[in-house]
Amino acid sequence: MAKIKMKTHRGAAKRFKVLKSGKVKRMKAYKSHLLTHKSSKRKRRLRKATYLEGASAKTIKRLLPYS
């Protein structure tokens, strides 16, 4: 019998990227709507990507077996 392939979690694949270094990159939340009352400084900070650490990075890597 053929070996069963692992499936990629599509929701995680759209939200996270595993880099060559092994870090998991993600974009920040609170940036899609209701932006008029948020300051320019805050919106500028939200544009930048950030990285997951520790247990949460390990969990996401498990959901993305081929990345």
From Swiss-Prot:
It comes from the Bacteria. One of its GO terms (biological process) is translation. One of its GO terms (cellular component) is cytosolic large ribosomal subunit. Gene3D superfamilies: 4.10.410.60. Keywords: Ribonucleoprotein, Ribosomal protein. InterPro entries: Ribosomal_bL35 (IPR001706), Ribosomal_bL35-like (IPR021137), Ribosomal_bL35_CS (IPR018265), Ribosomal_bL35_sf (IPR037229). One of its GO terms (molecular function) is structural constituent of ribosome. The keyword Cytoplasm does not apply. Belongs to the bacterial ribosomal protein bL35 family. This is Large ribosomal subunit protein bL35. It comes from Caldanaerobacter subterraneus subsp. tengcongensis (strain DSM 15242 / JCM 11007 / NBRC 100824 / MB4) (Thermoanaerobacter tengcongensis).
